[in-house]
Amino acid sequence: MSAASVSKVVVVFSGGQDSTTCLIQALTQFDEVHGITFDYGQRHREEIEVAKSLAKRLKITSHKVMDVSLLNELAISALTRDAIPVSHELMENGLPNTFVPGRNILFLTLAGIYAYQLGAEAIITGVCETDFSGYPDCRHDFVRAMESALVQGMDKKLEIITPLMWLNKAQTWALADKYQQLDLVRHHTLTCYNGIVGDGCGECPACHLRKRGLEDYLQNKAEVMASLDKATETGKPQT
């Protein structure tokens, strides 16, 4: 399915840097942009109110907040248990302790059902394999497998679009700047695992990744923007 044949999309929207950047881009490309936000009792659940505020500010077609508290009961993680401190070290299985097992499986499944009911042709998600937090459900192969499962399971053409898949964090900042929304993304989104809007706590892994990307972009704007254009043109990982 080509982007030209898509007019209505559902954006998996957390209110963070990545999903907000995807939402901003989608508003320039599609006739109807519907956001869906998931409340799973997350540690940083302030992001839900941030998502509501941004949805209104950006005037998207509709915004739905869905209760998926069952995920909190099933998945033990630093993002679902306040008693588990967020760690910079990997667990024995090689994953960060902020990994929520099954989260993107559930989110994309529910977004797919919602897209089916709306008659949307695509789901947009801000997952990224190039410069990510080590989550297996952010990988390209996973997304393609989920897309195939949704298409086969619902007998409907449905594309999962991943605008950030092969971008690093600096390029993601450049993408927001390309649409004249760098300040909005910097100051009004919530990426911090401790629930602090904007630049965040500065200590958690999410804040470190976000800050490093921003500093790289601000120090090398022309170079990063050029690399963004190349990555966007090829749609493939950059070597």
Curated annotation (Swiss-Prot):
One of its GO terms (molecular function) is ATP binding. Zn(2+) binds at residues 192, 201, 204, 207. This is 7-cyano-7-deazaguanine synthase. It holds the Pfam family QueC. Pathway: Purine metabolism; 7-cyano-7-deazaguanine biosynthesis. ATP binds at residues 13-23. Its cofactor is Zn(2+). PANTHER family: 7-CYANO-7-DEAZAGUANINE SYNTHASE. Catalyzes the ATP-dependent conversion of 7-carboxy-7-deazaguanine (CDG) to 7-cyano-7-deazaguanine (preQ(0)). Binds 1 zinc ion per subunit. InterPro entries: QueC, Rossmann-like_a/b/a_fold. One of its GO terms (biological process) is queuosine biosynthetic process. Keywords: ATP-binding, Ligase, Metal-binding, Nucleotide-binding, Queuosine biosynthesis, Zinc. Its EC number is 6.3.4.20. It catalyses: 7-carboxy-7-deazaguanine + NH4(+) + ATP = 7-cyano-7-deazaguanine + ADP + phosphate + H2O + H(+).
